């Protein structure tokens, strides 16, 4: 099976989270979680771990409870391998379910590197949305032809 994954930048991760409805207040925590769990690697798969489980994708979603290997299932009703590609919208949906059920404390990487460690939280306030970037490029394009 060929997996198409990528290493996200902090700003790419922040944009994906924002586009998926994550509150701006928590985006730094989510990006820190993603960095601590997977290094922002969307195709990372680790295992076997406890109960022969594997962890998938940028959030390291575990096959023991949240998804099933080779078929849809688990609490997120998802195929684990789908969390190991460059489309993280499904990963975010499942991670939101995990967070709403168990909190950020579910992820040991977040507990060790992000919790009570405000200095470790990435500053993503300077990240521009794609719409803002497109607008800036369009303005430069118009200015080029205005002279």
For each feature predicted by the language model, list its residue ranges.
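Catalytic and binding regions of secreted/periplasmic enzymes and modules that target cell-wall glycans
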Residues: 49-147
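Surface-exposed patches in mature extracellular/periplasmic domains of secreted proteins
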Residues: 21-31, 42-47, 104-116
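Export/targeting segments at the very N-terminus of extracytoplasmic proteins
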Residues: 1-41
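A near-ubiquitous, low-amplitude feature marking generic local secondary-structure context
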Residues: 13-17, 44, 71, 77-78
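Generic signature of intrinsically disordered, low-complexity, basic-rich segments
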Residues: 9-10, 24, 46, 132, ...
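Conserved helix-loop-beta core of C-type lectin(-like) domains
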Residues: 28-35, 40-62
